[in-house]
From Swiss-Prot:
Pfam families: GerE (PF00196), TPR_MalT (PF17874). The gene is malT. It comes from the Bacteria. GO terms for molecular function: ATP binding; DNA binding; DNA-binding transcription factor activity. This is HTH-type transcriptional regulator MalT.
Amino acid sequence: MLIPSKLSRPVRLDHTVVRERLLAKLSGANNFRLALVTSPAGYGKTTLVSQWAAGKNELGWFSLDEGDNQQERFASYLIAALQQATGGHCSTSEVMVQKRQYVSLTSLFAQLFIELAEWHRPLYLVIDDYHLITNPVIHDAMRFFLRHQPENLTLVVLSRNLPQLGIANLRVRDQLLEIGSQQLAFNHQEAKQFFDRRLSSPIEAAESSRMCDDVAGWATALQLIALSARQNNNSAHQSARRLAGINASHLSDYLVDEVLDNVDVSTRHFLLKSAILRSMNDALIVRVTGEENGQMRLEEIERQGLFLQRMDDTGEWFSYHPLFGSFLRQRCQWELATELPDIHRAAAESWMAQGFPSEAIHHALAAGDAHMLRDILLNHAWGLFNHSELALLEESLKALPWESLLENPRLVLLQAWLMQSQHRYSEVNTLLARAEQEIQGMMDGTLHAEFNALRAQVAINDGNPDEAERLAKLALDELPIAWFYSRIVATSVHGEVLHCKGDLSRSLSLMQQTEQMSRHHDVWHYALWSLLQQSEILFAQGFLQAAWETQEKAFQLIKEQHLEQLPMHEFLMRIRAQLLWAWARLDEAEASARSGIDVLSAFQPQQQLQCLALLVQCSLARGDLDNARTQLNRLENLLGNGQYHSDWISNADKVRVIYWQMTGDKKSAANWLRHTPKPEFANNHFLQGQWRNIARAQILLGEFESAEIVLEELNENARSLRLMSDLNRNLLLLNQLYWQAGRKNDAQRVLLDALQLANRTGFISHFVIEGEAMAQQLRQLIQLNTLPELEQHRAQRILREINQHHRHKFAHFDEGFVERLLNHPDVPELIRTSPLTQREWQVLGLIYSGYSNEQIAGELAVAATTIKTHIRNLYQKLGVAHRQDAVQHAQRLLKMMGYGV
């Protein structure tokens, strides 16, 4: 819960002086990105800005305290303030902060600005007491905020010092409105108005001016003069002389003498006790001070001018002026030292009663009461964990003695989950093992099962599937149905293990169970994870359309639950890109991979490896080797500067080996093959992929026997485990092996199998990537006219893709190529004596690429009759009678020129 008073603009009091000259300056704030009001304590920053804010409906106010250095807390209040200002316009951002579903403050602000782009009226956000922020991450995020905020949004910052917000840059660009302590200091006219409203007897203007000069226009000093004069019947000028030259750091003695020593004992104790509260209401005051009517007492203190200010229009919430509150808290530590722990306990109990466990923890820590802290955590820790109050939880658990954790082992479990969330896997197991060893008496079976569920998650994250499976099964055997979170974890881990072991049907079933349980209990990150796993399994089984539909469910879940900034969103964009690539929708695949990289913009560059590999893959499918090389340079740099899971390395190696194949780089392939470890098994699609990389490198190096042994074993495993997509890929690679080894019949046999299987998988680009060798075989199959209708259609589609993306390498007879050909010593005499025109060379290239007459006419934008004339002429010049003869003639010319066709 958010404390309402922190989001309420201070109430304007009747007796305050209206600072017309400063309000006039602030009236132009909407023309600036930042309005900055800075001065030491007590110069009236908050009062001035609250006067300016009066009547502005589209304004959010956020009053900071020390606890707002926690990023999650800062974000929650900032978004809530803007929600108040816009009447709930930023609903997506609000859900994201409530569920902590954002990667960083900057990514959250980026989402916020997307929503605010549709808000066209002037908008203001006031952040008070910014000097309390010491977290550099928040400073960085607010600099990002200022750089990218919409033009119609003005940020108003109140601070005792110059904040680290890139002020100089804003000043140079004339995007900064500044008001400092010299401008905030009262002038003679304002001082006269102030005393006239505060003192029962008016004073002369000259005396008022002298007092203003004595204290250099410091508003707090003027207030103290008026307070002292009322309390002691002293002359105001006498108080002014004493305050002359004083500053905030030396104010304590004065406040003791002139304020605390001049109130009755009851009021003094009230001030000291209530000062421990950062904000207060009736219930808190009654519990902390023992007063019977807290609201009445607060209003009385306010009337006495004792630096108490209302924080909302209802008058329910109050706080002390920061300068006076700090002074009172210091005096409380000195004067009420023995009572202070009890006062903090009372505050904690009252905050708990009002439903604010975070504030209660703050006071329990201050009280040093481990028992109270333990009780609060036992009742509220998991709620705080689910809302990502991780820093507060970590501080709280560290404050508890180890013996207390052992007596309440669920707190040990919480501490272990905290470590797991921070990827401190080895520490998790150490902590749980120590706890199990030292817990007195028999350990509860359910708790032991919860320990095992967490251990299972750690084991699978750490790449130990056998141990993960053992622990997940133990957990599921012992966990009651009501312990839903741990059951979700254990079921998910078991399903993931089966996925790794190639037991796809059982894995799919468990992941569907995980999804159902997670949706039922609103555990959205596990619901999303289960959908991603289901999609990968369906893809591996060859059911790409079903995988697509599962991905659609995942996209919908992300949208509904605002999960866009979770790293799993990148996973979804990546597997969508893989699917689009398989279907030769290359532009969409590339866009999806780039979107995945955008999701990871706040993470280390190494996290982008998989999406970067997909960008290389798109370039390779297009035959764009220059672009592929540029992207490969980035990919290989990342590979050399990080530690990666084996399947990440396999995907990166795949595009490297294909690139070497397409460029004939046998040296790189041989070097890679020497240093690449060979997996022990091939029982899932990750391991199949790496073995396929090895076989492709072996084929490139002419090691056909070794490659055939690998591929035959891969096919055997793929058939037994129903890894149909892998089988489709393996058949295509086996086809290339047979083709290059001169085993044309075997090559045709496995190509026919691959085409038939592609009716299920929908594969296109996996064929295209094999280039001209694949094109030649498909041309022959099409010309034989023996393919079934579906396979015939797919073969034609694949051939069109190869022609589109790879023709420039193999069959595009451009002017440069023709010139080199005619100068070649072995060029046929017929071509030398009766050369083709440039257009006829183009037509020959398109015939060789498998184009029909109509397609050639469309490609060259001429009439079909014109194409027939060109074909008749080139047949005559080449001395051929049929289309197949022309294809063979073009092939001989390409071979003569050194093309490996």
